[in-house]
Design a protein with these regions (language model features):
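Interhelical loop and helix-boundary elements at the membrane-water interface
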Residues: 1-21, 50-74, 100-111, 146-181
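Interfacial segments of multi-pass membrane proteins
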Residues: 1-5, 27-31, 70-102, 115-124
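Membrane-cytosol interface at the C-terminal ends of transmembrane alpha helices
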Residues: 94-95, 140-142
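C-terminal all-alpha effector/ligand-binding and dimerization domain
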Residues: 138-140, 169-170
Length: 181
């Protein structure tokens, strides 16, 4: 959304959510009897999102450094949606609350995995598969790993804050109130 605008960002986010959900749906179609396969399919979608073969990274001497990609937040939400569609109605509003309160996209991204863990743990406590909790844990590990630079920025107080959030608004208000030299 930062680079291409709101519309392109929204379409990209929706397609990335479908990437995670589609992995589950494809696994369910190919192997309907194995919930383990359904649970691990979106993990591989997240890995493919974070380390895309279509985004190789090279140094200044054109030597291969690795694969680039996103952090995996949207495919994580999509994977949760694919495993249990109602999870979307829980995770998205909570993620929006985190985003519009903190103003940090990285914190929001990490929180969606935490929300998936909580949602699936509550479901598992009522007799549904515990393997879905493992999905949330593994997705969370992948998200935290991908967001290591952002975590460093958060700890240093240099992470970018979105102005449309409560935190961003308060920060802008404090800066505007500072006396000018």
């Amino acid at each position: 959304m930062r680079a291409a605008g709101f519309g392109a960002g929204l379409i990209t986010a929706l397609l990335d959510i479908l990437k995670g959900a589609g992995a589950v749906w494809l696994a369910q179609a190919i192997n309907p009897g194995s919930h383990w396969v359904h649970t691990f399919a979106p993990i591989f979608a997240i890995l493919g999102h974070n380390y895309s073969i279509f985004l190789p990274d090279f140094d200044e001497n054109r030597r291969f450094k690795g694969l680039r990609g996103g952090a995996g937040g949207a495919p994580t939400v999509g994977g949760a949606f694919g495993l249990w569609p109602t999870s979307l109605a829980i995770i998205l509003p909570l993620g929006a609350l985190v985003f519009f309160t903190t103003g940090y996209a990285s914190v929001t991204t990490m929180s969606v995995a935490l929300f998936a863990i909580i949602v699936f743990a509550i479901r598992a406590a009522s007799g549904l598969p515990w393997i879905d909790v493992l999905y949330g844990v593994l997705a969370g590990i992948l998200l935290v790993w991908a967001l290591r630079p952002n975590i460093k920025n958060l700890l240093a107080g240099t992470e970018r804050v979105v102005n449309i959030s409560l935190h961003g608004w308060l920060k802008a208000k404090r800066e505007a109130a500072k006396p000018k030299p």
